[in-house]
Amino acid sequence: MLSPKRTRFRKQHRGRMKGISYRGNRICFGRYALQALEPAWITSRQIEAGRRAMTRNVRRGGKIWVRIFPDKPVTVRPTETRMGSGKGSPEYWVAVVKPGRILYEMGGVAENIARKAISIAASKMPIRTQFIISG
């Protein structure tokens, strides 16, 4: 699972996901990519599930790039705890994804294989996505 080695602060505000992604919205490494169409928090488990699904489908020959990284800690309070007594402890990590952001890239495979692998990875994501080709 992906997570930062260390951060300056243990806990973060939730923030809000306004507008579209201006960074990370172009294909840089591969030929095919999966692009987000909705804003969401994507957990490190979801990122890993998508990556594994793509790797299994492509087998050898193909190369996969994960273009998002979960760097935001999400805190959760213990169950049946009364209000007050501070913020909960960090439980898992999420990547903040805005519309237009590239999630995964792929290269070195035929288009039909890439389409199939990326569609399987897309089904693991909690948002609507689209398959795009560079050029």
UniProtKB/Swiss-Prot annotation:
SUPFAM superfamilies: Ribosomal protein L16p/L10e
GO (cellular component) term, any one: mitochondrial large ribosomal subunit
Disulfide bridges in this chain: none
Chain segments annotated as transmembrane: none
InterPro entries: Ribosomal_uL16, Ribosomal_uL16_bact-type, Ribosomal_uL16_CS, Ribosomal_uL16_dom, Ribosomal_uL16_sf
Compartments, as annotated in UniProt: Plastid, Chloroplast
A GO molecular-function descriptor: rRNA binding
Alphabetical UniProt keywords: Chloroplast, Plastid, Ribonucleoprotein, Ribosomal protein
Gene3D superfamilies reported in the protein's UniProt record: Ribosomal protein L10e/L16
Main subcellular location of this protein, as a coarse class: plastid
Pfam families in UniProt: Ribosomal_L16
Biological processes per GO annotation: mitochondrial translation
Family (UniProt): Belongs to the universal ribosomal protein uL16 family.
HAMAP family: Ribosomal_uL16
Subunit structure: Part of the 50S ribosomal subunit.
UniProt-recorded name of the protein: Large ribosomal subunit protein uL16c
